[in-house]
């Protein structure tokens, strides 16, 4: 594997682990609000980010590329509201989208067609992630505090679906 691409993938897989901790911190904050459904929802978000990292690791290992696990920054632990948590999450996911697009650009540059195919799934996943958070923000703004109970029940219905390794 081209070294520039391997470096970018290593950076992203570590960012996925960092993202998991971001969502874990958000889940911990939400648990103080008594919103068990949203607590569940963000717990699943945490699991998904770890699954993404594992998928990157498998891809790197399958390509005989060196995986480098690094440290990460302490995530933010305090927020003003569920709405702020979701707004921060949307901004975070937009940053992930930018990173994935950068990796796709490198894969195209070095003509690594296996990486292009692999990362297409992530391109589509990011469209879904941004859409989910955007819709959640819209709903929270629409119902305000009085309707959070019903939204919380909807969030409780989310289940973790394991991501196929390939």
Residue positions per predicted region:
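Iron-associated oxidoreductase/ferritin-like identity signal
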Residues: 1-166
């Amino acid at each position: 594997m081209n070294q520039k691409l391997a470096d970018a993938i290593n950076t992203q897989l570590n960012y996925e682990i960092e993202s998991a901790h971001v969502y874990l911190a958000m889940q911990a904050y939400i648990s103080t609000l008594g919103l068990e459904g949203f607590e569940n929802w963000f717990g699943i978000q945490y699991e998904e980010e770890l699954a993404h990292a594992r998928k990157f690791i498998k891809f790197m290992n399958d390509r005989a590329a060196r995986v480098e696990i690094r440290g990460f920054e302490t995530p933010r632990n305090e927020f003003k509201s569920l709405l702020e948590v979701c707004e921060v999450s949307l901004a975070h996911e937009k940053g992930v989208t930018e990173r994935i697009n950068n990796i796709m650009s490198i894969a195209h540059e070095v003509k690594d067609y296996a990486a292009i195919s692999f990362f297409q799934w992530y391109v589509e996943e990011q469209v879904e992630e941004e859409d989910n958070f955007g819709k959640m923000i819209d709903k929270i703004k629409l119902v305000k505090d009085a309707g959070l109970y019903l939204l919380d029940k909807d969030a409780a219905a989310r289940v973790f679906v394991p991501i196929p390794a390939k």
